[in-house]
Amino acid sequence: VNRHHTGIAHWLPALLLAGVLVFASDLPISRHLLGTNLIQGPYASLLAASTDLGPARPQQIQLTAALAGHQRPDDLIDWTHDRGLTVSWRPSDDWAIVEGNPDAIARAFDVTVHDYRGKQGQQFYASPQQPQVPEALRGEVTELGRILGYTPHHVSRPDIALDVPDRGLSPDALLTTYNADKLAADGFTGKGTTIVIFAFSGYDQKDLDTFSAMFGLPQFTPETLGDPLPVAHGETTMDLQVAHAVAPDARKVVVNARPTVQGDGAYQKIGKLFEDTDRAYPGAVWSLSIGWGCDKLLTAADLAPVRSALRAAQSHGTTAYNASGDLAGLECKGGTDWDSVPGPDDIGLDSVSSIPEMTSVGGTTLSTDDRGTWLAEQTWFDVPLSQGTGGGLSALFDLPPWQQAAAAQVAPERRTGKRMTPDISAVADPFTGVKIVLNGDVVIGGGTSQSAPIWAGLTAVMDQYLLANGGTLIGEINPLLYRIASGAPRPAFRDITLGANAVDLAGPGYDLVTGLGTPDIDNLARNLLIAQRIQA
């Protein structure tokens, strides 16, 4: 039996648990729009679940244009000017923003633009059609983004297991599990590094103080970039404590990401937020547990500002981790934005986590002894709760060169030439996770939103180790991870071969549920130092 087999025979039973399949083509569509580049899938579901308010009211709307290079887009500027539109572009960017009123946008790109009211009461503009690159611009513009003034998003809330007596990993046990205890004993605790948590909600300082006192860690008060965050919901509290458990001497920063989903232009705003964070904290390690919409809602052009800003930060030494998601490979489920019977359209990835330069972090169920010594791990998948590690194939990005060898290890029908996620994993099961303090109570954290800050903390430790031994900050880590996995002096990953999510199975080598596996940090740090010396 091929352990990686992931065809319809595998995931169909899981989807049928909730009902029969429906397809986006069954959604009601206005007759006059048929055959005019209609967008299908989750995007169509979003509009079908919203109230069509008619032609968009006069306002400035926008879409993103991905450019073929970094030169000034003179053709685009002239073309849009002739049609009553404007272009925003900065020197050296490989993307631009086209803006104008809805009528001008509609005429220029031969689309319909209406206003909609969503299920949550939000009002936004959208076109049910995908704008095409005009023939006159095809030498300069490679792709256009969606015309959509709303970004479906979710505020992650940690999966908390309230009835797990005497279980959960202490900070010392967590270090032991991933073989980072030796580095900690040698004084590598993240000193001199910075960990940035991107967040939609706040935290309770009393919980941070109690956590630190309980486990004998230094007290800390995070810095904040942006306006003060609203009331704590648990996610940011967990992220901070988990990162502190691994790297207690690293500086902690919370970045208010909530403005990115207020109004339109979310991905341009995310790119700007990344730039601001890089400017304020160059070389920091980033942890993201925010869902900024699934990849099937977008085009790659929409994410161009995010990808550009991430690359720039990585050139300054930043390493970035993003949770792969907790919907077991079904990240395109509608949630509060639309209702539908489970079907193929649900299969998808978190959009930002799928960017090739972003390190996507999956989740596992962990078994250890009382001291945290690693015994076993398997894929995290809770079928009754429809929760589990995210992962799968990108709808937007081609397979990067550093994943070529890994692609040969997945099932033949999954070798589509597209970016694969996750890249790596850490414990996410809320019944086997890390002890945290929330609202004054000791509970067990969970979700891939726990896995990402674990890796962020471990990377802060590795950065300190590398700098102390003549190395450099890691920066973009993905190519290094895959190179080390394909052959290095020390085994750096524990291969997770058991389990599945709703779409794929784990198996030997790389798989689409846990990636390369979970880390042996002592070995990984030493391999990275060797790789840096060879490259130098």
Each predicted region: which residue ranges?
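Secretory targeting and sorting signals
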Residues: 2-28
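A short, structural micro-pattern
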Residues: 1-3, 15, 57-59, 352-355, ...
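Polar, glycine-rich mid-to-C-terminal structural blocks
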Residues: 356-396
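Short amphipathic alpha-helical face segments that pack within enzyme cores
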Residues: 16, 453-461
